[in-house]
Swiss-Prot record:
Lineage: Bacteria, Bacillati, Actinomycetota, Actinomycetes, Mycobacteriales
Cystine pairings recorded for this chain: none
Gene behind this protein: ilvC
Gene3D superfamilies: 6.10.240.10, NAD(P)-binding Rossmann-like Domain (3.40.50.720)
Active site: 109
Gene Ontology cellular-component annotations: cytosol
Pfam families assigned to the protein according to its UniProt record, in alphabetical order: KARI_C, KARI_N
PANTHER family, A to Z: KETOL-ACID REDUCTOISOMERASE, MITOCHONDRIAL
Protein purpose: Involved in the biosynthesis of branched-chain amino acids (BCAA). Catalyzes an alkyl-migration followed by a ketol-acid reduction of (S)-2-acetolactate (S2AL) to yield (R)-2,3-dihydroxy-isovalerate. In the isomerase reaction, S2AL is rearranged via a Mg-dependent methyl migration to produce 3-hydroxy-3-methyl-2-ketobutyrate (HMKB). In the reductase reaction, this 2-ketoacid undergoes a metal-dependent reduction by NADPH to yield (R)-2,3-dihydroxy-isovalerate.
The protein, known as: Ketol-acid reductoisomerase (NADP(+))
Residues that coordinate or bind Mg(2+) 2: 192, 228, 232
Binding locations of Mg(2+) 1: 192, 196
Species whose genome carries this gene: Mycolicibacterium gilvum (strain PYR-GCK)
Single GO BP term: isoleucine biosynthetic process
Residue ranges of every copy of the KARI N-terminal Rossmann domain listed in the record: 3-183
EC number: 1.1.1.86
Amino acid sequence: MAVEMFYDADADLSIIQGRKVAVIGYGSQGHAHSLSLRDSGVEVKVGLKEGSKSRDKVTEQGLDVDTPAEVAKWADVIMLLAPDTAQAEIFTKDIEPNLEDGNALFFGHGLNIHFGLIKPPANVTIGMVAPKGPGHLVRRQFVDGKGVPCLIAVDQDPKGEGQALALSYAAAIGGARAGVIKTTFKDETETDLFGEQAVLCGGTEELVKTGFDVMVEAGYEPELAYFEVLHELKLIVDLMYEGGIARMNYSVSDTAEFGGYLSGPRVIDADTKKRMQDILKDIQDGTFVKRLVANVEGGNKELEGLRKQNAEHPIEVTGKKLRDLMSWVDRPITETA
């Protein structure tokens, strides 16, 4: 079944312009949403806890800021863009006591609603607007008169206005200039988590580290291994990003293309696919989210342990040394702090 797509001509910007919007959180997405909503003629306030380091930045950029509870009380549309693991507490403490009949609660990701970590009252519209790009790109494209494609979804719609409101919001941050795709909280959440775990973060990271280990254990210099399995990965991903797998294969040498066809299926085989299916099942049945919640309730001890273990891999030592030679590479905060 083809996805439903919407564009500026399908959206009524006046809907969101007639509402008061609170954006809770001012990270990557929060700043892009807030500034673009304001520039689209929407009345916006940003919700940040007292003492937040981002408060000065908000006021410097000409936006009003108050506590999450106060902006939730003021608004009739609340966009919750705090980290996933903080959202349930913010909802219970700051948002739920201030919700009124007819309010709308929006999210940039469906995890907390789909897995029942947040249970909103039945008289509130529950929607999602999820740009498919980082906040700095969302904002830059908006300023340039363009946009980043967005997903929208409605999980609860007591007044029958959810889709029109979500589409209007997406248009106000530039999404409808590029295209807005209708989905569900379930599909957005499960596909997003699977992509992160099996391919983008977990899968790619382990592939790179294992490739590095194989070469170093075979006697090759760590510096050569780093260049071949990590540094050059960006070149390949950029080609795929621009034109798909076909563009990448067209652009590399015949030797690389031929070798990739022969050896790729030996690395990622039917057993790998079965394990990826198991990962998807753990996401779908809530196994992963239960472990995520247990980690948070345990003070992030499991996550901190995994971070420490990962940081000690030899590829990190080699990489830092080589990046010192690369004047064109922006140094990450982990190496400049």
